[in-house]
């Protein structure tokens, strides 16, 4: 039954990511994907420290956060930003450093 809940949670995470991706499409920086990825990292940190059940953790972290965050879209957006090095490196640093900080902040809560 965990697999069913995990799949449902993943679908919800993907829907949330979709709505974030619609945000600020005119910006050079893909803010929707950045917000989705940073939120997913933060939530994984929160779940890591506050969810005792391995099954519930799998549903929330792997399911919901897995659907919310996106490595493939991130890399697609990065390759599109290669022509503007400043934006490319800003997005790269914000995503990876921000994700690491977000996980630690979630754990500290």
UniProtKB/Swiss-Prot annotation:
Keywords: Cell membrane, Ion channel, Ion transport, Membrane, Metal-binding, Sodium, Transmembrane, Transmembrane helix, Transport
A biological-process GO annotation: cellular detoxification of fluoride
Subcellular location: Cell membrane
Single annotated GO MF: fluoride channel activity
GO CC term (a single one): plasma membrane
Major localisation: membrane
One protein family per Pfam: CRCB
Binding positions (Na(+)): 66, 69
Regulation of activity: Na(+) is not transported, but it plays an essential structural role and its presence is essential for fluoride channel function.
Membrane topology (UniProt): Multi-pass membrane protein
Catalysed reaction, written as an equation: fluoride(in) = fluoride(out)
Annotated transmembrane regions: 1-21, 29-49, 55-75, 87-107
Lyase in keyword set: no
The keyword Transmembrane is assigned to this record: yes
InterPro entries listed in its UniProt record: FluC
Function, in words: Fluoride-specific ion channel. Important for reducing fluoride concentration in the cell, thus reducing its toxicity.
Family: Belongs to the fluoride channel Fluc/FEX (TC 1.A.43) family.
Name this protein carries in UniProt: Fluoride-specific ion channel FluC 1
């Amino acid at each position: 039954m965990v697999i069913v809940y995990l799949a449902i949670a993943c679908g919800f995470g993907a829907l949330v990511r979709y709505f974030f991706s619609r945000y600020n499409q005119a910006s050079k920086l893909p803010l929707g994907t950045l917000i989705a990825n940073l939120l997913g990292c933060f939530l994984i940190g929160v779940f890591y420290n506050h969810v005792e059940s391995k099954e519930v953790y799998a549903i929330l972290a792997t399911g919901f956060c897995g659907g919310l965050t996106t490595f493939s879209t991130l890399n697609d957006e990065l390759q599109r930003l290669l022509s503007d090095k400043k934006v490319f490196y800003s997005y790269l640093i914000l995503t990876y450093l921000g994700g690491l900080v977000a996980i630690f902040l979630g754990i500290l809560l």
